[in-house]
Amino acid sequence: AQLFAKAMKFVGPIRKALQFPTVFNLLGPLVNPSQPKCQLLGVANLDQMRLYRQVYQKIGIDYGIVNSIDGYDEISLTGDFKVTTNDYERVFRPEDLGFAVASPEELKGGATEEEAKEIFDAVLENRALPAQKNIVLANAAFGFQVMEKGSKSIEECIDIARESIDSGK
């Protein structure tokens, strides 16, 4: 956020020093300087999901909001996850989408920026662990569904995401 929203540059050091979530964590997606017309947002809990849903409905954005019930602020595939969009609200299981349940150990993001970059590159180059790839596929698929305004099924959107990664495009 500090790279794109100039005002956040001044708040960043204070937020880091506090070492706990602040109101700026909630405001960040709402003050995006690019003013997106659609957005997929991961939230840490169901209270945040309800809050963002109400705000997005009022401002008229096409949205998808996701939360893994076990606390991840994205679709982690470690268990059930909830998705709410302009069109529906539903709890999914990884198996509903044809994915295996992932273990938290398979989600390690890397302790350094370089390790995180390596995982990112591995996903894009189709050499990531199956769980890492599946998590990206699931999150990307719901993002595609938001962009398509619900005109495609989630299964079609998973296929689009898979084709994109597998083809390297």
What are the functions of these language-model segments?
Residues A1-K169:
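Glycine-rich anion-binding loops and their surrounding alpha/beta cores
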